[in-house]
Each structure stands twice: as C-alpha cells, then as structure tokens.
C-alpha cells in the first residue's frame, strides 16, 4: 500500500499498534532502539465512535496499551497526544472516543506510578495547516472541511447552533510544542492551545462565502480551556503559538 506524504530517510511500516505481529516480529527485525515514542496514531473521530466501537477498542485501548508497554520495557519516554475533549462540560464522557482518550491518560499516569514510565501528555485543539485536505474520510477538522467546501464552490456546513466556540492551533505550533514537551525532563501535562478562539459562525465568516446550518452532532460539547494549564505550558516549555488562523485562511 502506497503511503502518502512519504519522507526520505524514514522507515515506514504499514501496520496497526493493536497487531501483536508488529511488536513481536516487524519491529524486532528493524533492530530499532528509539529515544522516544510520539504516540499520535489513534482513532480520532467523535461522532462515528458511537458506531465504530470495535475500532475504538483495537486502536485506543489495545493499541495504546501495547505502545505504553513497549515504552515501559524499553525505558523510554512516551509523548502522548491526548484530547481537549477531556476538558469539556461532561469531563470527557460524552462519546466513546472522548472516554477512551481520558482513560489512556489515566493509564499512562498509573504506569508512571507503578513502573516509572516517563511521559509527556499533550492536549490538542483543532489543528489546521498544510496537507489537511488530504484526508478524505468525511470526518476532517472543521477548518479542513470548510476549505474543501469553499474550493468546491459549496456552502459551508455549520453544525448547529454555530455559536459553539473552538480554539485553533496551527500544526507547526503543535509540532514545536511536542518537541519541547519531549525535551523537558519532567512527567507532565501540556495544553498546546493556539491564540485563535472563535465561534464556528465566526470561523465561517472568515472564509467569506455562503454557509448553512445543519443538525447537531451527537457527542459534541463545549470545551473548557483551563487557563492555568495554558499559562503553565507556555512558561515551562517556553512555547507560544505564532501562526494566525485568519492569515492562513486568507491564503487559501
């Protein structure tokens, strides 16, 4: 299977973290001794998670357990991409996806207590940026969806009521935060939050084209940004988002 966006000097393995064959045979053949594991590869869709419960089980539970076990056995740090859904009105219980991400944070922290696992937990907020339009499964981030709809000359579809607010972070800022979280020699949590917060209606208006409201989605809820953790993240990582959402949209 051809892998898109393939980089030079990088070895790709087309497998699943839930697959024992990957851990016991494929990875062993590489004789690979990593310094860190950036665990970013999980099932990451909110609404479909009510249907795709088996995928959630395999990817977010079995898969992440295998990654955590690997890091424990190798005595290396795991940098985990948690979800901002944990910081919501329902405390991360509003969907199977959100619940799985919250439980994985607990798993990692407990492995640190029980076995000395080194970790950095990072919370993502609506990433956007280059190549976001390469995803074609229908459940992209809202900025990517709006970009595709605008290029196709279609009205933007806004999930009702449209007044719900979201914070947006450019992928380059997120990557910068991930690297700094790895380099900091502490077990800690970090909110990689951009400086652009707006309602979905306000976001649509930035695209300067027609839009329409569609029905509410199951599992969506109001995010609560913990300002103390945001300020703490900026301080201890010496990190701050530098990209602007409006500037990105204007270039499309």
Positions of PLM-derived features:
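NAD(P)-dependent short-chain dehydrogenase/reductase
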Residues: 96-98, 106-166, 171-176, 182, ...
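C-terminal substrate-binding subdomain of Rossmann-fold SDR/epimerase-dehydratase oxidoreductases
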Residues: 150-252
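Residue-level signal for the nucleotide or nucleotide-sugar donor/cofactor binding architecture
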Residues: 18, 51, 59-62, 95, ...
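A general structural signal for well-ordered alpha-helical segments in protein cores
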Residues: 64, 143-144, 200, 204
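Short beta-loop-alpha junction of Rossmann-like oxidoreductase domains
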Residues: 90, 130-133, 201
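N-terminal Rossmann-like NAD(P)+-binding domain of SDR-like oxidoreductases, especially those catalyzing
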Residues: 1-127
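Hydrophobic alpha-helical packing elements
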Residues: 22, 26, 56, 100, ...
């Amino acid at each position: 299977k051809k892998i898109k966006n393939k980089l030079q000097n990088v070895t790709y393995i087309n497998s699943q973290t839930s697959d024992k064959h990957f851990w016991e045979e494929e990875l062993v053949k590489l004789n690979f001794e990593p310094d860190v594991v950036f665990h970013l590869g999980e099932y990451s869709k909110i609404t479909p998670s009510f249907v795709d419960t088996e995928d959630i089980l395999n990817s977010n539970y079995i898969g992440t357990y295998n990654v955590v076990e690997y890091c424990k056995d190798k005595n290396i740090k795991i940098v985990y991409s948690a979800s901002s859904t944990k910081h919501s009105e329902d405390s991360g219980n509003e969907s199977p996806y959100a619940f799985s991400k919250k439980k994985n944070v607990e798993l990692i922290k407990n492995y640190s207590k029980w076995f000395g696992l080194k970790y950095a937990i990072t919370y993502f907020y609506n990433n956007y940026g280059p190549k976001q339009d390469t995803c074609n499964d229908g459940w992209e981030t809202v900025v990517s969806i709006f970009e595709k709809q605008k290029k196709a000359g279609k009205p933007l579809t806004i999930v009702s009521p449209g007044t719900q607010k979201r914070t947006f972070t450019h992928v380059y800022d997120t990557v910068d935060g991930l690297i700094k979280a790895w380099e900091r020699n502490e077990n800690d949590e970090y909110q990689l939050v951009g400086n652009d917060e707006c309602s979905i209606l306000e976001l649509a208006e930035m695209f300067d084209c027609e839009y329409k409201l569609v029905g509410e989605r199951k599992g969506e809820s109001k995010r609560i940004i913990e300002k103390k953790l945001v300020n703490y993240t900026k301080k201890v990582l010496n990190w701050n988002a530098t990209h602007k959402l409006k500037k990105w949209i204007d270039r499309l």
